[in-house]
Each structure stands twice: as C-alpha cells, then as structure tokens.
C-alpha cells in the first residue's frame, strides 16, 4: 500500500440511546470525513471505544467502514489486544474484509517486557499479511514501547509505522531520524502533532478531527509540507479544542461535542459516563473559537 499521509481520524463509534452501535450514522460520518478531506478512516481504537464493544461488533464496525469507504480513502482497523492470539484473529478479519492496515496497541494490563512487546508484534506481522501500524500509548497501557524496540520492529516485514501517543517530541525526533525508509511516524496527540509533522512526521491520528475534519486535514497537509506559517495558524485556532477534548477521559468530551454539532448522540457504554456539566461552557467556547459554532 502507499504510505498514509495527513489526517487520520480516530473515529468515534456512534451509539443509539440504548447503547447499540448506530451503523447508519457511522456510514454518514465516514462520508462526511471523506468530503472534508480526511486522509484515512481509523476505526475501533481508543476513541472508537474498543474496550466496550463485543468482538462481533468490533468486526462489524470494521466491515461497515471498509464497505462504506469503498476504496475512496484507506481504512486503518483497530486490531490490537493484550492477547497475541486474539490480536492475530482480529488482524485476520481486518484483512479478510479488505482493511488497508491495522492499528495494533501495545499489550496492556499484563505489562510485557520490551522483548515480549517485540515478539507480540512480530508474531502478528508473521501470521497475517496486512500492514501493521504500531500504537504506543503508555498512559493507557502502562507498558511503554521504547524507541529501541520500535526501531527493531521497523525492520520486520509488514510493520509500516507507529502511532506515537506519548506527546514526547524528543522521542519522536529520534524515531524520525533513525527509522528506515518506508516506516511512517504518526502523532497520536493532537496538542503536539504539528511539531511532530513539521519535524518530518507523516500525519496525525486525531481525536479533534471528529469535530473539525477540514481544519485538521488542512493543518496536517501544511505541516507535512513544511508550511509552518499555515500550520501554526490552524494549530492555534484549534489549541483550546485540543485541550478541552481531553479534559475528561476520551471519548467523553468529543462525543459531547459531536452531539452539540448534531453529528451523533453522546451515548457511551459503562464504565464511560457523560461529561461533567461544568465543562460544557468551556468546550463550547473552544468550539466557537475553532469556528465550529
């Protein structure tokens, strides 16, 4: 596959008031993102509430996303887990239905060593012939995949990039400097993504894109091209939004914001709960500053 460059939306999983997955709205959101310039549709990751959807729902969300996208842009299918065998099965399904690549998170809770992390991802890449993007988010997984392990995995056929969600720009710089040709470095942190891309990163797996897809697409396009002036202007316009969308655990604020825009219900499944009322005015103000209201 060709490298994915630009804004990759970490798409929410829309749900009806009864908590069931709202597939018609999922299809509408995908069409909207493509029209707004989003470069890739990422489904059933953190923002897509992968921990609280069933395996059957997880697979159906991937299938629907691939079907609705219909080759217009790539689909990055969440297919990670803390069981290597289960992650392999999800990757196999993603390949079967035509996803372009998978996003595979560092195993969580069982806290593998660096060697365990390496063997986990190598096993997935060797078992399933589908491009794999690694996902390092130690704030959620506890285990932190160190740059040395990432660079080691970059040599494994089929491992094509990493979503680096630490927000650590120095770390990102070392990865960009040392990664082999063809290995893509993506930000997983909206607040620092512009810096990562201006320094040579390839794109941003974005929560903010759920509510501001065109602005995020324009920001990524400018930053990847080295247009610091344009990227800086858009970044500062979105800065308050980046901050408020993480005022409570993701995807709580972004689902509230999407509901405010009439895009989908704010429904989530327990243990996620609605956003605290005292944050509503601030998030609405940030949305106005970003030109969304």
From Swiss-Prot:
Keywords: Amino-acid biosynthesis, Cytoplasm, Diaminopimelate biosynthesis, Lyase, Lysine biosynthesis, Schiff base. It is found in: Cytoplasm. One of its GO terms (cellular component) is cytosol. The record marks 46, 109 as: Part of a proton relay during catalysis. GO terms for molecular function: 4-hydroxy-tetrahydrodipicolinate synthase activity. Pyruvate binds at residues 47, 205. GO terms for biological process: diaminopimelate biosynthetic process; lysine biosynthetic process via diaminopimelate. It catalyses: L-aspartate 4-semialdehyde + pyruvate = (2S,4S)-4-hydroxy-2,3,4,5-tetrahydrodipicolinate + H2O + H(+). PROSITE patterns: DHDPS_2. Its EC number is 4.3.3.7. SUPFAM superfamilies: Aldolase. The keyword Amino-acid biosynthesis applies. Pathway: Amino-acid biosynthesis; L-lysine biosynthesis via DAP pathway; (S)-tetrahydrodipicolinate from L-aspartate: step 3/4. The active site is at residues 135, 163. It is an enzyme of class 4 (lyase). Catalyzes the condensation of (S)-aspartate-beta-semialdehyde [(S)-ASA] and pyruvate to 4-hydroxy-tetrahydrodipicolinate (HTPA). Belongs to the DapA family. PANTHER family: 4-HYDROXY-2-OXOGLUTARATE ALDOLASE, MITOCHONDRIAL (PTHR12128:SF66), DIHYDRODIPICOLINATE SYNTHASE (PTHR12128). Homotetramer; dimer of dimers. This is 4-hydroxy-tetrahydrodipicolinate synthase.
């Amino acid at each position: 596959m060709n490298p994915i460059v630009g804004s990759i939306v970490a798409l929410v999983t829309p749900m009806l008031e009864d908590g069931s997955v709202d597939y018609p709205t999922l299809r509408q959101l995908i069409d909207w993102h493509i029209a707004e310039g989003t470069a890739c549709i990422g489904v059933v990751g953190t923002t897509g509430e992968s921990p609280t959807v069933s395996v059957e729902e997880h697979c159906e969300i991937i299938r629907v996303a691939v079907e609705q996208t219909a080759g217009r842009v790539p689909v990055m299918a969440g297919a990670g887990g803390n069981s290597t065998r289960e992650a392999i099965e999800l990757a196999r399904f993603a390949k079967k239905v035509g996803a372009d690549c998978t996003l595979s998170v560092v195993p969580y809770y069982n806290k593998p060593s660096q060697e365990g992390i390496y063997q986990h991802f190598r096993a997935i890449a060797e078992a399933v012939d589908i491009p794999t993007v690694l996902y390092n988010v130690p704030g959620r997984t506890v285990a932190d995949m160190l740059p040395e392990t990432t660079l080691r995995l970059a040599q494994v056929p089929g491992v094509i990039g990493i979503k680096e969600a630490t927000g650590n720009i120095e770390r990102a710089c070392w990865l960009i400097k040392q990664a082999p040709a063809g290995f893509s470095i993506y930000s997983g942190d909206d607040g620092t993504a512009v810096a990562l891309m201006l320094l040579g990163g390839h794109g941003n797996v974005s929560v903010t894109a759920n509510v501001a897809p065109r602005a995020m697409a324009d920001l990524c396009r400018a930053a990847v091209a080295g247009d610091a002036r344009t990227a800086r202007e858009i970044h500062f316009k979105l800065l308050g939004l980046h901050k408020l969308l993480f005022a409570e655990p993701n995807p709580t604020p972004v689902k509230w914001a999407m509901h405010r825009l009439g895009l989908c219900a704010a429904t989530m499944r327990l243990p996620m709960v609605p956003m605290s009322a005292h944050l509503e005015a601030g998030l609405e103000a940030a949305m106005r500053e970003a030109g969304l209201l």
